[in-house]
């Protein structure tokens, strides 16, 4: 028999699309059976007559606290080995991201460490980062590969990411990012490496069921639009969703390229142009903001938020947790950065880590809002108003986190 639970005396920010703003319900109640929400709304509308305790429910009095959906970190590179703190010092001394990458640092530095690590070592090194995000109410996380750059080590990274979801109460969505950078053994042979990605790595990941999506780094220090298009086409051929690191450091028309391949999202987007915005809007894509990388790289060209808003493109926000350009393990701080650096509104930040983040992962039917039929993923907060989650820095007001009803 499935466990039945009720959370009463709560204020809800349901994030439901059918309600204005954050979908606030002041005198709210949530009921769940097993891992699914069966009711979320006004307590007075809940259909019982003799009191929930007499109907086999376990009742939790929330004491007037706020309940939001469990938070979603929809773009991370959380599984890695080694440290790139030395690059932080180099950037402080004036080196650019491109200079570090071209000198053999950056992603390639992490590739060497990941290739040398076992799957168990990757899990052990990644757990503290995952624990930090879980501690801030995250119940769903996307984790990319991209530090193996060959069949064996890309699959090893994906297995480690999946293993994290087996040892912690969290839903892990895995994304293959083999087209992250050119491995050293393919120096000067980018097209040959893309052949490997398309003809061997993507099919292997799909056959093993280790990835639900494929990503690529379309950039001057990554891969050309033509090479990226090949990767996205191969992903589609093997039944995988696609997303894209696009227009972060330059305008290569990455947003429009992602739209042509019906991507779930395009991410970063600092140099996205009007044509890219229009293409993304027409394709119904999500624009994922990653202010952590913008902050660490001390960029000065923010994403075109006003254009995205005018076009009706949904905005998500994520930590981009990675060892070099965004070693950020706080979804709350990511929201603050999005508001401060990009001028995102509180509503955009909160929807961007719930409903719109779910859409960026293709999970909008399962999670991201407090609605009947959705997974019972909740975050319960000691706050007076939801804006505090975006405003405060260094304070974690999480009271309780509920994952799949538990």
From Swiss-Prot:
GO terms for molecular function: imidazolonepropionase activity; iron ion binding; zinc ion binding. N-formimidoyl-L-glutamate binds at residues 147, 322, 324. It catalyses: 4-imidazolone-5-propanoate + H2O = N-formimidoyl-L-glutamate. Binds 1 zinc or iron ion per subunit. 4-imidazolone-5-propanoate binds at residues 84, 147, 180, 248, 325. The keyword Translocase does not apply. GO terms for cellular component: cytoplasm. It is an enzyme of class 3 (hydrolase). Pathway: Amino-acid degradation; L-histidine degradation into L-glutamate; N-formimidoyl-L-glutamate from L-histidine: step 3/3. It comes from the Bacteria. It is found in: Cytoplasm. It holds the Pfam family Amidohydro_1. Its cofactor is Zn(2+); Fe(3+). Its EC number is 3.5.2.7. Catalyzes the hydrolytic cleavage of the carbon-nitrogen bond in imidazolone-5-propanoate to yield N-formimidoyl-L-glutamate. It is the third step in the universal histidine degradation pathway. Belongs to the metallo-dependent hydrolases superfamily. HutI family. NCBIfam families: hutI. This is Imidazolonepropionase. It comes from Hyphomonas neptunium (strain ATCC 15444). The gene is hutI.
């Amino acid at each position: 028999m499935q466990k039945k639970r009720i959370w009463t005396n709560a204020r809800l920010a349901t994030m439901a699309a059918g309600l204005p703003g954050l979908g606030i319900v002041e005198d709210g109640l949530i009921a769940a059976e097993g891992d699914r929400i069966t009711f979320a709304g006004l307590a007075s509308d809940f259909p019982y007559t003799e009191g929930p305790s007499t109907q086999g429910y376990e009742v939790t009095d929330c004491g007037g606290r706020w309940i939001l959906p469990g938070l979603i970190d929809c773009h991370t590179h959380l599984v890695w080995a080694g440290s790139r703190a030395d690059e932080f010092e180099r950037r402080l001394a004036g080196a650019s991201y491109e200079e570090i990458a071209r000198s053999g640092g950056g992603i390639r530095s992490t590739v060497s460490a990941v290739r040398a690590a076992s799957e168990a070592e990757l899990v052990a090194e990644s757990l503290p980062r995952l624990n930090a995000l879980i501690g801030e109410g995250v119940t769903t996380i996307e984790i990319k590969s991209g530090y193996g750059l060959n069949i064996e080590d890309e699959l090893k990274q994906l297995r480690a990411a999946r293993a994290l979801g087996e040892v912690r109460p969290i839903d892990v969505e895995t994304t293959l990012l083999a087209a992250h950078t050119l491995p050293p053994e393919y120096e000067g042979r980018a097209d040959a490496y893309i052949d490997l990605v398309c003809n061997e790595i993507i099919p292997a990941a799909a056959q093993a069921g280790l990835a639900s999506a494929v990503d690529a780094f379309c950039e001057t220090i990554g891969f050309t639009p033509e090479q990226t298009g090949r990767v996205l086409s191969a992903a589609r051929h093997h039944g995988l969703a696609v997303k894209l690191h696009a227009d972060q450091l330059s305008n290569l028309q990455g947003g429009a390229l992602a739209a042509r391949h019906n991507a779930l999202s395009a991410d970063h987007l600092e140099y996205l142009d009007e044509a890219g915005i229009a293409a993304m809007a027409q394709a119904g894509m999500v624009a994922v903001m990653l202010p952590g990388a913008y902050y660490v790289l001390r960029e000065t060209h923010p994403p075109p938020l006003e254009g995205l808003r005018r076009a009706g493109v949904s905005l998500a926000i994520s930590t981009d947790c990675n060892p070099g350009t965004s070693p950020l393990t706080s979804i709350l701080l990511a929201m603050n950065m999005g508001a401060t650096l990009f001028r995102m509104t509180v509503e955009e930040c909160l929807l961007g880590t719930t409903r719109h983040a779910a859409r960026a992962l293709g999970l909008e039917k399962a999670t991201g809002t407090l609605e009947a039929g959705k997974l019972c993923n909740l975050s319960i907060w000691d706050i007076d108003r939801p804006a505090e989650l975006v405003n405060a820095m260094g304070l974690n007001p999480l009271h309780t986190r509920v994952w799949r009803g538990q």
